[in-house]
Amino acid sequence: MHIDITHYLIVSALIFTIGIAGIFLNRKNVIIILMSIELILLSVNLNFVAFSAFFQDLVGQIFALFILTVAAAEAAIGLAILVVFFRNCGSIAVEDVNVMKG
């Protein structure tokens, strides 16, 4: 069995759909929203790498590495903000984020 670009695109579309569904179905937990955003970024990276390998060009793979770097920084900063917010408020529910105003 030969794995071509359509298989990668199908897997990427499934991962993207799971990420979007995670955002829309669970709007109360900030950690799940962050994980869903990471899934969406992972599916975009899979598309970049698949097209890069298909067209035999390294630009997509380099761009995917940059996206992974930014996603790791985004996850670290987001989790650090959540830890501080949990220490101050005792909850990480999305409804309680409005307390940060002021």
Curated annotation (Swiss-Prot):
Q: What is its EC number?
A: 7.1.1.-
Would you indicate the residue range of the signal peptide?
none
Record localization: Cell inner membrane
The record lists the catalysed reaction(s) as:
a quinone + NADH + 5 H(+)(in) = a quinol + NAD(+) + 4 H(+)(out)
Lineage, top-rank taxon, reads Bacteria
Biological process GO terms, please? Answer: ATP synthesis coupled electron transport
What GO annotations for molecular function exist for this entry? NADH:ubiquinone reductase (non-electrogenic) activity; quinone binding
Q: How does it sit in the membrane?
A: Multi-pass membrane protein
- Where exactly are the transmembrane stretches of this chain? 5-25, 31-51, 66-86
Q: What is its main location?
A: membrane
Q: Which InterPro entries match?
A: NADH_UbQ_OxRdtase_chain4L/K, NUOK/Mnh_C1-like
Query: What is the disulfide pattern of this chain?
Result: none
Its GO CC terms? NADH dehydrogenase complex; plasma membrane
* Keyword list, A-Z: Cell inner membrane, Cell membrane, Membrane, NAD, Quinone, Translocase, Transmembrane, Transmembrane helix, Transport, Ubiquinone
Q: What does this protein do?
A: NDH-1 shuttles electrons from NADH, via FMN and iron-sulfur (Fe-S) centers, to quinones in the respiratory chain. The immediate electron acceptor for the enzyme in this species is believed to be ubiquinone. Couples the redox reaction to proton translocation (for every two electrons transferred, four hydrogen ions are translocated across the cytoplasmic membrane), and thus conserves the redox energy in a proton gradient.
Query: How does the annotation summarize its subunit structure?
Result: NDH-1 is composed of 14 different subunits. Subunits NuoA, H, J, K, L, M, N constitute the membrane sector of the complex.
Q: What family does the database annotate?
A: Belongs to the complex I subunit 4L family.
Designated name of the protein: NADH-quinone oxidoreductase subunit K
Q: Which organism is it from?
A: Bartonella quintana (strain Toulouse) (Rochalimaea quintana)
Gene of origin?
nuoK
